[in-house]
From Swiss-Prot:
Gene giving rise to this polypeptide: MT-CYB
MF term (GO), any: ubiquinol-cytochrome-c reductase activity
Protein name in UniProt: Cytochrome b
Protein's organism: Isothrix sinnamariensis (Sinnamary brush-tailed rat)
Additional facts recorded: Heme 1 (or BL or b562) is low-potential and absorbs at about 562 nm, and heme 2 (or BH or b566) is high-potential and absorbs at about 566 nm.
Transmembrane segments: 33-53, 77-98, 113-133, 178-198, 226-246, 288-308, 320-340, 347-367
Key words, A-Z: Electron transport, Heme, Iron, Membrane, Metal-binding, Mitochondrion, Mitochondrion inner membrane, Respiratory chain, Transmembrane, Transmembrane helix, Transport, Ubiquinone
Amino acid sequence: MINMRQSHPLIKMINHSFIDLPAPSNISTWWNFGSLLGVCLMLQIITGLFLAMHYTADTSTAFSSVTHICRDVNYGWLIRYAHANGASVFFIFLYFHIGRGIYYGSYQFKETWNIGVILLFMVMGTAFMGYVLPWGQMSFWGATVITNLLSAIPYMGPTLVEWIWGGFSVDKATLTRFFAFHFILPFIITAMVMIHLLFLHETGSNNPSGLNSDSDKIPFHPYYSIKDILGFMFMLLLLLALVLFSPDLLGDPDNYTPANPLNTPPHIKPEWYFLFAYAILRSIPNKLGGVLALVFSILILMLFPIMHVSKQRSMSFRPFSQCLLWILVANLIILTWIGGQPVEHPFIIIGQLASISYFCIILILMPTSSFMENKMLKW
């Protein structure tokens, strides 16, 4: 008699995705981040659902409802901080996942990669709208500044901004619709993740060598399911350490002040995981130019499959490209630091240089180094 997990229509799908899935025998811990992101997403949906039970999306009560969650709801503080810091952990893993994809040439699975980039945009949008919900000073002013960027769009910009606001400023209508979008988007993201996995399982996983691994596959369970559980333990340890010891480490103190449209904070900045993009936005004096640079700083990821000129897929055996990738990582850390600094003398020029080098490394230096490596190997 055939096994139920191989015959039942629904269980068969799960079986082919997580149990009998043929996986390369040599994939490293860098391949753990996909499943970790899935766990993060589930955690965010669960904690978010419980927060939504107590939160009120109204300008007069939003701030006090968050205070009520932390003070009066059973373990409300835990749920709230797990959700807030869960977002930070989510982005750390997202950036690792993308970095792994660039290093090992996983972007050559074009459909999987492009859906991944769309997912990144959706997660960023969700996180931004979530940051607005507590209705603190940074929530209000962050929403005002970022939504205002759309006014740079020629002809239809100002109308578009008022349409998003639902009025002539960020107010009750804006908060209500942001809550609605913040609630629905994670479910759309979950559906997109399934499509992401569907395309990945069409080709099978890449591996550190970048070579075809069809001749050497092992079942996902028990090998990688056990390996992933180890990753989950580390993730839980990191998240609990953040939540229980320093829950406000990555937050902004200004957000503990209720939103006040009459009082602008001295320095408006987004959450730490958007600072690199914010630095690129600020480095261009022109409004439309800054917005375009901001969008292209993420959209540039879609160009990776087109710009791949190396004869080798992975960077494992390409020292020049490896160096450039780590310079790019250092550059992104500098941009993140600059995004959190005030707009004054040394920081402005550092931000501009880091922004130029970000685009130069990806668009010029990386393809050039790949071309040189080909020549050195007489390919």
